[in-house]
Amino acid sequence: MSDLSEALNEYTAMRQNLGFVFRLPASLLRTFVAFVDQSGSPFITTELARQWALQPTEAQPSTWAWRLSIARRFAVWRRASDPRTEVPPADLVGQRYRRKPPRLYTDQDVVRLIQSAAALPSAKKLRGHTYATLFGLLAVTGLRINEALHLDRSDVDLQEGVLTIRRTKFGKSRLVPIHPTTQDALQAYGEARDRIIPKPATQAFFMSERRTRITEWITRYTFAVVSRMVGLRPPTRGGRHGHGPRIQDLRHRFAAQTLITWYRAGVDVERELPKLSTYLGHVHTADTYWYLEAIPELLQLAAERLAQTPPEVTP
């Protein structure tokens, strides 16, 4: 094992101990370290980081920038123990990685998505039930996609109206209360699921017709299919489902709609924001503040609220 590989193991352990789910970055960094090792260089160089970041060549520039950002953070950490390490400039591949602005689905968009998902064909008629209920749950709770997919039956308390979210992005569990109408929808899905699949092979709440837990990949694919069906994604050649609104935008919609409702109702958003952060599973309130900058309507409402606030008077 090379010195750089050992350093990566230490770096990965450090990030995980800080509470980060680091599987994908760690996997990418292993390919980066292998790339550096194969070049014969004993340390990270700017040119090697650039060459690695620009793979695959047909990827979007934002993907290259994201790959570079992962390598760059590792290089910053590595430089403390190996001064030979070169830290590549953040804009080395033409642009910095930035979070994509969210697409705020309208209520009509969500209804069309759910209705089209419910009509998805399948042999046992469970597929439509599963994805219509899943997409609806994401829209009204703001759960991350993996949080919903990792729900077991025991995590869904339909008597109390509470979901127990165990496998979160940062490894912390939390309780998510749900509306009575959401309870009813989950109850109806559970009854349909158990009728169609009386002997499941898993305790997963959301289940495939193969009696197994549905995967993130197939869920994202199905969402893309349904988005094209309702016109939210443009048609493309070769049967691909193109670019457009993403499934995580359902989470963004929930957060944004909550904040917009608070502003319009005159709620003290500064005081209530930590509650929304906890509900969403954000570790830092700053992650929730991001919506104020990313969504023009929220930025305008915040500016209007600030303009209405009387200035402080110092004695």
Question: What label would you give each PLM region?
Answer:
Residues M1-P315:
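Conserved catalytic core of the tyrosine transesterase superfamily
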